[in-house]
């Protein structure tokens, strides 16, 4: 699978996990390969609309040459299908996140795609740290250069989030359009584990449509959020909608982790506050095997 041009730059551990899972599930090699390709498409192929790494490099070069960061970032984000869906409401989207979170000194962006290009819209404290992770090694390498043109310290790496979630001891964690993919990869139980590993979930954003725009998911946004949050010690206290996305504000339940409950509508001091976003009410393109293999 790594021999295919589309997938050769993916995190080897991610591909090896899928190959091992396919081999354990199917004795027939053809069926195993088909299964693994479907999982690759669900987690990566369905979201690529161009050449993300090249788009990031071009964005950095334009900003360094004097281009307006928001204009350059918005253009580059169109090289990633999932990130591209958010370009029309970036400003109100992150204004609401800022209202809920306040200025953040540290951010972790899981399954980031090209969302780090949205830094100019985010409420970040001076010198903030922005750590971003995806399965594409070349894209992660390109994203590191954002630290040369954005007023943040950028760390980027290729990580298989289903196998291990990076430590989230930060102010805000962004997990955009990822919960459904995690469910497809490992099932609902793994989603609960995924949420617990994030330590403190404060926001959740769901896509109202798939990449194709078709409706028909068995679950709606509320169902996915409630299932993901169940047993984590957090509750939904507010929500908002932008275009095809729904945001959910979560805070710790009273007395969890030995701490008192925060004031109504406020985040608990010192807690990580992720924004999580997944397609929730439409059957995604990711359900199909990638015909290009």
Curated annotation (Swiss-Prot):
Pfam families: FmrO
Gene for this chain: fmrO
Function: Specifically methylates the N(7) position of guanine 1405 in 16S rRNA. Confers resistance to aminoglycosides.
Gene Ontology BP, a term: response to antibiotic
Stored SUPFAM superfamilies: S-adenosyl-L-methionine-dependent methyltransferases
Note: Protects M.olivasterospora, which is an antibiotic-producing bacterium, against self-intoxication.
Residues annotated as binding S-adenosyl-L-methionine: 47, 80-82, 86, 111, 134, 160-161, 176, 185
Name of the protein this chain belongs to: 16S rRNA (guanine(1405)-N(7))-methyltransferase
Class of the enzyme per the UniProt entry, highest EC level: transferase
Biased composition annotated in UniProt, kind: Basic and acidic residues: 284-293
Domain of life according to the entry: Bacteria
Segments for region (Disordered): 258-293
Keyword S-adenosyl-L-methionine belongs to the record: yes
Family, as annotated: Belongs to the methyltransferase superfamily. Aminoglycoside resistance family.
GO molecular function: rRNA methyltransferase activity
InterPro entries from the UniProt entry: rRNA_MeTrfase, rRNA_MeTrfase_GmN_bac, SAM-dependent_MTases_sf
Keyword vocabulary terms for this entry: Antibiotic resistance, Methyltransferase, rRNA processing, S-adenosyl-L-methionine, Transferase
E.C. no: 2.1.1.179
Catalysed transformations (reactions): guanosine(1405) in 16S rRNA + S-adenosyl-L-methionine = N(7)-methylguanosine(1405) in 16S rRNA + S-adenosyl-L-homocysteine
Lineage of source species: Bacteria, Bacillati, Actinomycetota, Actinomycetes, Micromonosporales
Residue spans of biased composition, Low complexity class: 258-274
